[in-house]
Structure formats: structure tokens, C-alpha cells
Amino acid sequence: MIFHPPLLFLGYGGFVIPSCLALAQALSRRQADEAAWTDVARPFTLAAWAMLTAGIVLGGWWAYMELGWGGYWAWDPVENASLIPWLIATAALHTMLIQTRRNKLHGVNVFLMALTTISAFFATYLVRSGVVQSVHAFGSGGVGVPLLLFILISVALSFWIALLARRSDTGELAGIESREGFLILTSWLLLALFADHPYRHHVARVQRLLERDRHGPRPRRRPRRGRT
């Protein structure tokens, strides 16, 4: 347990460096550095990915061996949230190879790297907002709505910057049967797994809120008085 939280936070924080490199390069509009930033960012991404992987694995081992929860992974909402940056970073590592070899997917890589860091804030939102019931959740403290607004604005700005980076896509992608094609398919699969968790979680929450508004709040039961 002593290594589990630090490794997770080192993994989350480590993604900030390649994310800043990607966004800075896209905003600078320097064509000479279009491919160079991936060479600089890849070691940082791999290091952060490795630390996050170790943190997730140690957390599963600790839950099974020490807490006796009966499994390594309970599909807890906060546990799944820690997996989201790992999935996006894995997809980004695949698409970085395509940018280096084919001079394509510049905008995709910029957006994925930014989304990796933003997804770490999404995990914080789940823990601190009080919107989920989890053994990892804490009191909200009023940070849920501001943090959610920050996440939405960051996603919108990152998407706009990624559109600017698409101007450097001068190469051609190979067919689906090629190695690059399989890398793209793998990346799409990882992103689909990433999108599934927040979509299902928030849709289910909206449905519960609608049901509550339709039927009204449940009446509170009065405590029974003991016999005298």
C-alpha cells in the first residue's frame, strides 16, 4: 500500500510533460518540430505509463492479498477511472509510431496526449465530487462543479489545438492490413474502452435523477419508539 498511491500520482503527473510538449508544439506552428516532439515526449510517456501500470497492479495485489476483497479488480468507478489514463496513453504510444513513420495523425496525437492529463483530473472529479458511491470516494467539499467545468473547457481547447495540428498531416496512411493499420485499430479499441466508462456512468446517473424527479423523493421512515 505504501507504493500504490505514489506510483499512481507519479504516473498522472508524468503525463503532464508530454502533454505540454504536444500542445506547445501545436501552438508554435513550427514545421521543423512537428515530428521532433514525439521523440522527446515518448520517453516521458513510457515512464509515466510504466509507473501508472505498476500502481494499478500493486493496487490490485493489495486489494486481493491484504484486504481480502475476493479479487484483484472490483470494477469500482474510481478504480475504472484510474484505468482511463492508462488506456489513452497506450493508444497514444501506438499512434506516435504512425506519426514518426508516416507523418500523419499529428492532431490525433496532440489531442490524445492532452486527454491523458485531463482524464487524470476526471479521476479526481469522481473521487471528490460525491457523484459516485465508492470505497475510494471522499467528501465533495464543493469542488465537483468547478472541476467538471475545468475538464469540459480543457477538452474543448485541446480539441481546437488538435485541429490546428492537423495541417502537418502530409503523409499517407497504409492499408488496414498493414502494421500501421493494426496500430490504428488497436488505438480505436482502447479509446472505445475509455469512452465506455464515463458514458455508462453518467447515463445511469441521469436516469436515476429523472426517476427521482418523476416519482419524488422517498419518504423517510420514522424511527420506532421503544416500549415503556
Predicted features, each with a name:
Residues M1-T228:
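Polytopic transmembrane helical bundles with strong interfacial aromatic enrichment
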